[in-house]
Amino acid sequence: MSYKQDHLNQAMNERTHSWDPPLDIAKKLLNLDKDDRRKLFTELKPDSFGIGSLMGFTKIEIDEKGQASFYCKPEEYHYNPIGSVHGGLAATLLDSCNSISAQCNLDKGLIALTTDIKVNYLSQISVDTGEVVARGKIDKLGR
């Protein structure tokens, strides 16, 4: 039996997700100062925005300095074809927490976008790893 035939005979898993309209959050963000941005992101449910829902983020924390922590419990749907969690999950967690940390440290009317990201993977992530946490810390805001 070929892989394709064997694969077609197996039951497929399903997962659904929902999210709030992302532009609603973005429009609010532009009109908020640093303190109100921190409050907005502290109150934001991790599954209420598209990427948080899609990737299965479980918790967001924002400290008094605006540094963000994003949490996720790896699940089977995060796996790649070689049997480990896809590296994109770690990269997305890092990008998300760094972005939110930046937003929480910007003045009203400004937003920041990621222009570059480099991830060095130190070990494999699997469902056995348990909850993973990414923490964003802003050392310097650039232009």
Feature annotation, model-predicted:
Residues 1-143:
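Terminal targeting signals and extreme-terminal segments of soluble enzymes
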